Amino acid sequence: MRRYSLKHVLALFSFIFVVWTIFRYFPEPPAWVTELILKPLVWLAPTFWLVRKVERQPLSSLGFTTKKLFPSLYWGIGLGMIFALEGLLTNIFKYKGLNLIPLDYTPAFFLGTIGLSLATAFTEETVFRGYIFSRLRLLWKNEWLANIVASLLFALIHLPVGVFILGYTPGVMLSYLFLVFVFGLGASFVFSRTGNLASSILLHV
């Protein structure tokens, strides 16, 4: 018997949101500490606990599977390129040219950035697509309603970083949250097409 419950979904999100808001209020530690240690502890640990101990489901119920692996690669990389192109065009129109932040583009920097991006994508996609979206879809039997709600929650979880770390003005904040919401819709869409979390993780990276 499956033990999926809306209460579990809301409790998980509320816990992560409150703890993460408090964390973001304080000075930011190094990115690797946040993405490799703190975020997995706050986001992944309670998610895995819910799945294994409360729902008594395998982790494959989160989308950890080798099924439809190649379609997942196509969806994730293909839609990811579209999002990347959109971001590039936005940058060009905003600054009337290509405005890139000067960084130390060494192999070590590149590999470190990719590694942190993968860690971030793995954690966030496991929680929001693997758990929240998939459970809402199973409970409501409506993919798009589940997608919209999960994407709204995904945007909301990015509010603390926008307020406390990035210091966005209200107008910029709304634009930022809207873009995160749109990305959430795309990530849930590709995950729903494949049932493999690799698709949304690749899109996220």
Which sequence ranges carry the predicted segments?
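Hydrophobic, membrane-facing alpha-helical anchors
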Residues: 1, 69, 101-103, 153-158
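N-terminal, membrane-interfacial amphipathic/helix-forming hydrophobic leader that caps
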Residues: 1-66, 87, 164
